[in-house]
C-alpha cells in the first residue's frame, strides 16, 4: 500500500508530502521534533463556496486540469490533443532522505517521475522527468517545478544586473498576482540570476524566515512566485523554451534541471550557510583539494598586446609579488590583435609567439607558478579562417541575417563537425601544453538560436555541457573558470564542471562590494573570482587605495589583474602585502561560516567568516559612502561561541590621522584601537564594539582569536 504521507528531514528543516491521489507538499519549514502523520489532518482544506465543488491541490506539477487556475507546471499537446493532463500517483519509493514519486495520466499517455532529495545541509533538490507513453510526438511548451511556501511569505527578493554590475538585489511585496523573471539570452545572464527568495516581511541578514530556490541551469529560464486568490503562495522555476524547441517521441524522456531549494528560520545568513555547505559537500571539487592560489591575469595589464619577452617579465614580477598562478588572457592565438577577428582559429599566433607557447609556459613554471590560458570555444568571428571555411557553422535561423555581438557569432555546437573541430583544437591545446587552468569565456548572447531550422538554445547549452564534460574527463588535473563577460554564466550546474567564477568584468572595489555580497547569498568565497585591479579602474575610472582594493578582493578567490612591470613601488608593496594577507587567511575564508551583518546605516557593509570550531574569525567593515550618522554605530559579532573569550586585533586599516594631525574624521579613536581587548563571545555578540569613523570607500579588517 502506498503511504499517504512521506517525510524528508534535515537538522534544520522538514518536508511533508501527501503522495496520493496527487503529489502535493503540505509542509515545508523548520524541523519538526514531534511529528506524526496523524497531525496532517489539521491541514485539510475547506471547500469555499462560489468556486469549484472540489478541493484543488497545489501539486508539484501545478495542474490546471485539477482546477488550480494558476501558472501550470506543464503545458503541451499532441497535435492539439492530450493538452490537459492530470497525473495520479502510481508508485512511491521512499528512503530516509529521498522520495521518488511516479504519476501517470493514462488518457494523455504521459508518465511523470518527481525526485526529491533532502541533503544533510538542508538543501532540497527537486527534479521532474516526463515520458511520452504513446505514439505521436507530445510537444512541450513548459515544464516547471512548483513548490509551495507559507502564506506569511509576503516579500520577494530577486537579483537584477547588467554587464559590469551583476547580482544587484531588489525587493517587491507579494500580496496579489505574480512576480516573474524571464531570461531569453541563451546563458544564465547578468540580468536575471535564476533564483528567488521569499520571506516574512522585512526579512534581513540575521532576522526573518525565508524560502529560497535556485535553478541549476545555464540557459534560458523563467522564475515565478505567485499569491493565489485563495491565499496560497508558491514558487516556480523552469528552463524556458522557444516554440517547437521540445517534443517527445514515444518512450522518450525529458528531465527538468535540478532545482535547489532552502528554508531558513534564521534570515538570509541561515539560507546562505546551508547553500555554502551543500556546495562544499556535494558540488565543489578542486583537484587535490589544494588551497586557492593567488592569480595574475594579464587582461587589463596588456590586453591584446602580447610579446613573449615582456610577458615573461610580467611573470617574474608576479612571482616576486607572491602570485601562484599566471594566466595569459585573450590575444595569444592566430590573428587575434583585437576583438574583431580570429575567434575560432585556435592555433598559436606565430607572429607573436614564433617559438610557440612553451617558452612562456616553461618560464612561468620555472618561477614556481601554475600556468593558465584564456579561451572562448563557443564563438566565431566573421573575420576568421574558420568562418571563411564554414560560414554555415553559426547558430542561426535560415533565411535571416544574424547580428554580431562584440563582432562575433555563436558557433553551432549542434553540428557534429563543428563540435569535433573545437574538441580537437582543445585536445591539442591541453594535450600538448602543460596547462593547469583554463579561463573559459562566453561573450555573446544568443539571438535566433537555431539548428536545422528549429530553435536550439536549449540544445546549445547541453552541447556546451557535453564539451566541457569531455575535456574535464580527458584532463582531470586542469581547473576551469566560468566567465561570460564577467558574471553572465554563474549557476550550480556549470559549477559541477568548473572551479571558479569570474564574478564581474568590473574590478572597481566599490562596485565589487555590492556584486560580491549579492553573489555570496548562494556561493561561498572560494569560487568567487575577486581581483585587485589598477589604481584607476578600467571599468569606472574611479580611483581607490590599494588597501580598499586589497581588502575587497580578500573575501573571494584573490588575484591581480594588471601589469606588475608597470606598477610603482608603493603599488607593488601593496600587491605583495595583500597577497601575503590572503595566504595567511584563505584557509579560514574558504572553509569557515560566512556572516553578513545587519547595520542600521546602509553606508556600512560588514561581512565576516567564523571558523567551524569557532576558535577564530575575520570581519571586514567597509565604509561605502558618507555615513548617515556622526557615529558609525556598534558592531555586534555573530557566530562566536558565547563562553569563549576572544582577543581582538586590527589586521588592516586605512591611514587614520586624528584632527590636529592632519585628519578630519575623529579627534579620538575607539579605545579598543589603542589597547588590547579581550571579551567573551557573548559580550561581542550582544554588547559589541564601537566602530571608528572612516572615510568613504575605505575598510578595516578585524581578527578575533580564542584567548589562551
From Swiss-Prot:
It catalyses: Hydrolysis of terminal, non-reducing alpha-D-galactose residues in alpha-D-galactosides, including galactose oligosaccharides, galactomannans and galactolipids. Belongs to the glycosyl hydrolase 36 family. Coiled coil: none annotated. Homotetramer. The gene is rafA. Its EC number is 3.2.1.22. The keyword Cell division does not apply. It comes from the Bacteria. One of its GO terms (molecular function) is alpha-galactosidase activity. Keywords: Glycosidase, Hydrolase, Plasmid. InterPro entries: Aldolase_TIM (IPR013785), Alpga-gal_N_sf (IPR038417), Alpha-glycosidase_related (IPR050985), Glyco_hydro_27/36_CS (IPR000111), Glyco_hydro_36 (IPR002252), Glyco_hydro_36_N (IPR031704), Glycoside_hydrolase_SF (IPR017853). This is Alpha-galactosidase. Gene3D superfamilies: Aldolase class I (3.20.20.70), alpha-galactosidase from lactobacil brevis (2.70.98.60). The active site is at 441 (nucleophile), 505 (proton donor). It holds the Pfam family Glyco_hydro_36N.
Amino acid at each position: 500500500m502506498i503511504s499517504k504521507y512521506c517525510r524528508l528531514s534535515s537538522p534544520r528543516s522538514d518536508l511533508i508530502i501527501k503522495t496520493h491521489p496527487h503529489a502535493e507538499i503540505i509542509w515545508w519549514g523548520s524541523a519538526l521534533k514531534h511529528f506524526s502523520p496523524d497531525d496532517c489532518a489539521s491541514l485539510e482544506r475547506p471547500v469555499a463556496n462560489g468556486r469549484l465543488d472540489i478541493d484543488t491541490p497545489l501539486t508539484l506539477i501545478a495542474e490546471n486540469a485539477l482546477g488550480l487556475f494558476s501558472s501550470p507546471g506543464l503545458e503541451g499537446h499532441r497535435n492539439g490533443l492530450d493538452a490537459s493532463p492530470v497525473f495520479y500517483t502510481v508508485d512511491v519509493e521512499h528512503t530516509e532522505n529521498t522520495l521518488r514519486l511516479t504519476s501517470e495520466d493514462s488518457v494523455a499517455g504521459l508518465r511523470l517521475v518527481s525526485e526529491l532529495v533532502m541533503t544533510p545541509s538542508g538543501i532540497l533538490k527537486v527534479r521532474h522527468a516526463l515520458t511520452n507513453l504513446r505514439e505521436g510526438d507530445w510537444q512541450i511548451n513548459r515544464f516547471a517545478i512548483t513548490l509551495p511556501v507559507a502564506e506569511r511569505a509576503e516579500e520577494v527578493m530577486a537579483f537584477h544586473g547588467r554587464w559590469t554590475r551583476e547580482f544587484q538585489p531588489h525587493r517587491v511585496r507579494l500580496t496579489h498576482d505574480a512576480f516573474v523573471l524571464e531570461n531569453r539570452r541563451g546563458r544564465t545572464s547578468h540580468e536575471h540570476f535564476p533564483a528567488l527568495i521569499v520571506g516574512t516581511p522585512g526579512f534581513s541578514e540575521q532576522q526573518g524566515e525565508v524560502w529560497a530556490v535556485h535553478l541549476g541551469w545555464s540557459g534560458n529560464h523563467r522564475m515565478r512566485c505567485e499569491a493565489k486568490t485563495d491565499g496560497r503562495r508558491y514558487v516556480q522555476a523552469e528552463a524556458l523554451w522557444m516554440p517547437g524547441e521540445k517534443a517527445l517521441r514515444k518512450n522518450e524522456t525529458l528531465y527538468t534541471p535540478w532545482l535547489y531549494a532552502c528554508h531558513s528560520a534564521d534570515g538570509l545568513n541561515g539560507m546562505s550557510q546551508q547553500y555554502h555547505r551543500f556546495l562544499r559537500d556535494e558540488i565543489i571539487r578542486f583537484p587535490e583539494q589544494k588551497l586557492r592560489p593567488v592569480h595574475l591575469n594579464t587582461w587589463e595589464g596588456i590586453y591584446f598586446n602580447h610579446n613573449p619577452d615582456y610577458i615573461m617579465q610580467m611573470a617574474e614580477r608576479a612571482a616576486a609579488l607572491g602570485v601562484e598562478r599566471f594566466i595569459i588572457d585573450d590575444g595569444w592565438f592566430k590573428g587575434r590583435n583585437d576583438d574583431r577577428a580570429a575567434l575560432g582559429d585556435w592555433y598559436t599566433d606565430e607572429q607573436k609567439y614564433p617559438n610557440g607557447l612553451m617558452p612562456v609556459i616553461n618560464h612561468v613554471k620555472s618561477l614556481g607558478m601554475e600556468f593558465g590560458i584564456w579561451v572562448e570555444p563557443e564563438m566565431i568571428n566573421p573575420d576568421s579562417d574558420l568562418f571563411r571555411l564554414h560560414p554555415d557553422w553559426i547558430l542561426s535561423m535560415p533565411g535571416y541575417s544574424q547580428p554580431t555581438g562584440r563582432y562575433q557569432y555563436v558557433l553551432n555546437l549542434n553540428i557534429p563537425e563543428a563540435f569535433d573541430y573545437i574538441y580537437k583544437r582543445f585536445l591539442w591545446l591541453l594535450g600538448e601544453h602543460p596547462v593547469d587552468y583554463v579561463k573559459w569565456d562566453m561573450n555573446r548572447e544568443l539571438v535566433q538560436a537555431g539548428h536545422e531550422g528549429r530553435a536550439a538554445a536549449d540544445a546549445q547549452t547541453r552541447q556546451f555541457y557535453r564539451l566541457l564534460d569531455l575535456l574535464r574527463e580527458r584532463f582531470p588535473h586542469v581547473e576551469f573558470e566560468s566567465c561570460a563577460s564577467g558574471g553572465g554564466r554563474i549557476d550550480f550546474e556549470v559549477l559541477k564542471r568548473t572551479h571558479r567564477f569570474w564574478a564581474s568584468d568590473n574590478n572597481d572595489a566599490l562596485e565589487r562590494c555590492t556584486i560580491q555580497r549579492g553573489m555570496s547569498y548562494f556561493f561561498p568565497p572560494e569560487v568567487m573570482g575577486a581581483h585587485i585591479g589598477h589604481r584607476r579602474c578600467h571599468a569606472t575610472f574611479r580611483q581607490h587605495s590599494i588597501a580598499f582594493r586589497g581588502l575587497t578582493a580578500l573575501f573571494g578567490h584573490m588575484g591581480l589583474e594588471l601589469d606588475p612591470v608597470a606598477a610603482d613601488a608603493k603599488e607593488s608593496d601593496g600587491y605583495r602585502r595583500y597577497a601575503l594577507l590572503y595566504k595567511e587567511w584563505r584557509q579560514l575564508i574558504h572553509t569557515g561560516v560566512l556572516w553578513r551583518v545587519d547595520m542600521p546605516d546602509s553606508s556600512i557593509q560588514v561581512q565576516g567568516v567564523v571558523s567551524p570550531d569557532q576558535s577564530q574569525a575575520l570581519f571586514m567593515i567597509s565604509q561605502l559612502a558618507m555615513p548617515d550618522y556622526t557615529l558609525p554605530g556598534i558592531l555586534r559579532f555573530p557566530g562566536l561561541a558565547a563562553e569563549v573569550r576572544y582577543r581582538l586585533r586590527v589586521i588592516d586599516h586605512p591611514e587614520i590621522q586624528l584632527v590636529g594631525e592632519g585628519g578630519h574624521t575623529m579627534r579620538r579613536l575607539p579605545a579598543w584601537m589603542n589597547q588590547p581587548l579581550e571579551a567573551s563571545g557573548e559580550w561581542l555578540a550582544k554588547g559589541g564594539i564601537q566602530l571608528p569613523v572612516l572615510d568613504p570607500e575605505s575598510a578595516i579588517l578585524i581578527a578575533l582569536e580564542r584567548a589562551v
